[in-house]
């Protein structure tokens, strides 16, 4: 929530600190009209396509015979949740697959490219393979250092509208990696962009740690519940030995 507030303040209201440390737009600094984004933006800023910042790569068409219980879990469109997380509870795994182009690392961003979930995206909290109809944004070797700006840019209503506009021409809503790449987003100057990404890093890290902790506790609960219900363990004895 803090990162979103900061994004709105800097990149929607344009009140990032200017050279004198004052809020840019509120203190009367120059704004210019940007035709592509259909709004006024700070002088010296521009627009860029998503592909310029982090190209989207399509997932791999795994065959059902390849799925098993071992290896890395595979992200399918159904795993992408409304709250920007992945629910990998019932995921299937792929073993002995070496195509790193289709690997989502921790802090990578993945997006649903078809069906009712189109345009939904999530932060990957571990290493996963990416299935077809899921896209992965290539944020480079240290995704966390560039994640903040892209993650919050995609949260803007404008991005979802663009996705629907492109996708709704088909019977089955569908968007390609190239079409996602072509969507325009704001291009701040490098100083402000890097500053924002740096401020987001600890917030996203904390969010990730909390997510992994909840996932671990949920797993423990699901393992313990059946044992408690059929009397194989009792709460008191197990807690006193903890």
Residue locations for each model-derived region?
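Non-catalytic DNA-recognition/assembly elements of restriction-modification systems
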Residues: 1-6, 24-60, 182, 186, ...
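Flexible, active-site-proximal loop/turn residues at the rims of small-molecule/cofactor binding pockets
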Residues: 81, 116, 189
């Amino acid at each position: 929530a803090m990162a979103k507030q900061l994004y709105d303040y800097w990149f929607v209201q344009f009140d990032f600190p200017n050279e004198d440390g004052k809020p840019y737009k509120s203190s009367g600094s120059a704004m210019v009209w940007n035709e592509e984004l259909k709004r006024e933006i700070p002088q010296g800023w521009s627009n860029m396509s998503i592909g310029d910042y982090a190209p989207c790569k399509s997932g791999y068409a795994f065959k059902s015979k390849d799925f098993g219980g071992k290896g890395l879990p595979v992200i399918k469109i159904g795993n992408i949740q409304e709250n920007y997380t992945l629910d990998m509870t019932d995921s299937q795994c792929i073993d002995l697959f070496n195509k790193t182009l289709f690997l989502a690392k921790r802090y990578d961003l993945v997006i649903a490219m078809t069906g009712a979930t189109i345009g939904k995206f999530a932060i990957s909290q571990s290493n996963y393979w990416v299935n077809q109809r899921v896209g992965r944004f290539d944020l480079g070797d240290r995704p966390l250092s560039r994640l903040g700006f892209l993650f919050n840019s995609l949260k803007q209503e404008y991005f979802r509208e663009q996705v629907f506009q492109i996708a709704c021409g088909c019977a089955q809503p569908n968007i390609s990696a190239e079409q996602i790449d072509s969507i325009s987003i704001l291009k701040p100057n490098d100083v402000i962009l890097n500053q924002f990404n740096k401020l987001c890093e600890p917030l996203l890290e904390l969010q990730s740690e909390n997510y992994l902790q909840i996932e671990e506790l949920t797993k423990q609960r699901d393992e313990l519940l059946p044992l408690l219900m059929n009397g194989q363990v009792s709460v008191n004895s197990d807690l006193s030995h903890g």
